[in-house]
Amino acid sequence: MLFCLLRFCYNSLMTRILDNELMGDEEFAERTLRPQYLQEYIGQDKVKDQLKIFIKAAKQRDEALDHVLLFGPPGLGKTTMAFVIANELGVNLKQTSGPAIEKAGDLVAVLNDLEPGDVLFIDEIHRLPMAVEEVLYSAMEDFYIDIMIGAGETSRSVHLDLPPFTLIGATTRAGMLSNPLRARFGITGHMEYYTDIDLTEIVERTADIFEMTITHQAALELARRSRGTPRIANRLLKRVRDYAQIMGDGLIDDKITDKALTMLDVDHEGLDYVDQKILKTMIEMYHGGPVGLGTLSVNIAEERETVEDMYEPYLIQKGFIIRTRSGRVATAKAYEHLGYRYTE
């Protein structure tokens, strides 16, 4: 039992339990849990309601759906939504990512493999090289590409017609997309953090699929501490299940859930030691701010991009920090949460 607890704590230190990026051993589980159609997809109602109309209209006209851009923090279901769209359209989905397409030839190979109406899903589309992106413009707009074959005096341009297709791009950093690329997406979907109610339903669905016994109150408590992110909720559920198995009788109730998450340093607002370190640094070293993002990153020994993409969005969404022109500022809520006295 002691070994299990030590291993539990060790894992929580080596890998941040609240990281909203996909971990290596979670890909199979995510595929298992993935809904197939919009009616099975929990949450993101605004995006779903729009897609229902656009998909139905495209099918009635027997046309390819307009290109779709899905943006928002990691772990909110952008990849899942892409698969759902393809299923709703009744077409194949070809999947790749921005970093995997290093040169124009890589993109041409992918495009040349598409059938009429297919969905091409490009994750991390903001990381496409500019040379590749420029080839994509005509492919998206007019369904053709012109490519250069050969080199020097023997080089020649080849025109290649493409079947109508739907490009679905996913990004965590929509601001990094160039204006010409962004303008070619006819449909945009902002994936937002999930409500506690939606996350509770997701937790209960996951528990049912994996034959776990969980009370509704425990599912709600887990949802509240999952940072509005299904990926994190499902990860925490597995760790709470382990705790219930070793330290209890296997039943996941609210008491077991609280003990397990407390052991993992996940507090009642869904903050972990890194989040708290950010807030404490702002309060103790800079009197609450304003403090620049670069300065803050150096003080907590994290990359600037990591703080900006992984930690800051949730802290802002929960009202613990605000952005100003002069830098980040800790709010009264942050002081109160950490037990500091707040003064104007």
Curated annotation (Swiss-Prot):
Note down the stretches annotated as region Large ATPase domain (RuvB-L). Answer: 4-194
Binding of Mg(2+) occurs at T79
As recorded in UniProt, its EC number(s) are 3.6.4.-
Q: What segment(s) does the record annotate as region Head domain (RuvB-H)? A: 268-344
Q: Where is this region: Small ATPAse domain (RuvB-S)?
A: 195-265
Q: Which domain of life is it from?
A: Bacteria
Q: Where in the cell is it found?
A: Cytoplasm
Q: Name one Pfam family in it.
A: RuvB_N
Chief localisation class:
cytoplasm
Q: Which transformation does this protein catalyse, written as a reaction?
A: ATP + H2O = ADP + phosphate + H(+)
Give the binding site residues for DNA.
Answer: R304, R323, R325, R328
Q: Which GO terms describe its biological process?
A: DNA recombination; DNA repair
The alphabetical list of record keywords is:
ATP-binding, Cytoplasm, DNA damage, DNA recombination, DNA repair, DNA-binding, Hydrolase, Nucleotide-binding
Q: Name one GO cellular component term.
A: cytoplasm
Q: Kindly list the positions annotated as binding ATP.
A: L33, R34, G75, K78, T79, T80, E141, D142, F143, R184, Y194, R231
MF (Gene Ontology) = ATP binding; ATP hydrolysis activity; four-way junction DNA binding; four-way junction helicase activity
Family designation: Belongs to the RuvB family.
Q: How does it assemble?
A: Homohexamer. Forms an RuvA(8)-RuvB(12)-Holliday junction (HJ) complex. HJ DNA is sandwiched between 2 RuvA tetramers; dsDNA enters through RuvA and exits via RuvB. An RuvB hexamer assembles on each DNA strand where it exits the tetramer. Each RuvB hexamer is contacted by two RuvA subunits (via domain III) on 2 adjacent RuvB subunits; this complex drives branch migration. In the full resolvosome a probable DNA-RuvA(4)-RuvB(12)-RuvC(2) complex forms which resolves the HJ.
Protein name (Swiss-Prot/TrEMBL) = Holliday junction branch migration complex subunit RuvB
Organism per entry: Streptococcus mutans serotype c (strain ATCC 700610 / UA159)
**According to the entry, what is the taxonomic lineage of the organism?**
Bacteria, Bacillati, Bacillota, Bacilli, Lactobacillales
Q: Which gene encodes it?
A: ruvB
